[in-house]
């Protein structure tokens, strides 16, 4: 089985979903954009703005939708004893809240409900300074106090987005997921 995830896109990607289907790919769409009357033909279409969704989470950014998907998947795998059966350690999803907070703020979604909670908890994770790439970015931005919502939206986010404008769209992913001291990534 070939599986593709789309994040923050796919809601209106009818021809792309048809192409994926022709290529034998299953696609899971994780999005938050407003859909039209019909949905893309995907293996799964997860969007809190679907007309049949009653979660009242339509204010989530795609990063929040993705996180909620991972929480649900993690819960399901745990209930089926999948981690133990495969001799794998269950991931601690809390450690990703730094990135969830960054994405939530940078997508300019309302800071209410679970968004607010994810940002508050994400800022706590950031203060622990365990993400090498994010630490390097914080140092470059000369943020010498506790990282704030303002810092995420106006100092860190724009630096990550700038790489995409000069043809290095994977730079942000490389930076935020590096296990090195980020020196090689930042060059």
Model-derived regions, located:
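Single conserved hydrophobic/aromatic residue that forms the stacking wall/gate
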Residues: 177-187
């Amino acid at each position: 089985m070939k599986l593709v995830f789309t994040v923050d896109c796919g809601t209106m990607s009818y021809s792309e979903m048809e192409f994926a289907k022709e290529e034998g790919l299953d696609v899971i769409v994780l999005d938050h954009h407003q859909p039209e009357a019909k949905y893309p033909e995907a293996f799964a279409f997860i969007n809190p703005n679907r007309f049949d969704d009653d979660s009242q989470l339509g204010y989530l950014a795609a990063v929040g939708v993705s996180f909620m998907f991972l929480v649900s998947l993690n819960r399901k795998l745990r209930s089926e004893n999948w981690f133990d059966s495969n001799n794998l350690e269950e991931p601690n999803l809390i450690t990703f809240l730094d990135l969830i907070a960054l994405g939530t703020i940078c997508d300019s979604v309302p800071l209410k409900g679970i968004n607010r909670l994810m940002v508050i908890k994400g800022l706590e994770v950031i203060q622990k300074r365990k993400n090498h790439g994010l630490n390097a970015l914080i140092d470059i931005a000369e943020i010498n106090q506790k990282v704030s919502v303002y810092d995420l939206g106006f100092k860190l986010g724009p630096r990550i987005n700038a790489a995409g404008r000069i043809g290095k769209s994977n730079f942000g992913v490389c930076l935020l997921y590096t296990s090195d001291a980020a020196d090689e990534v930042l060059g």
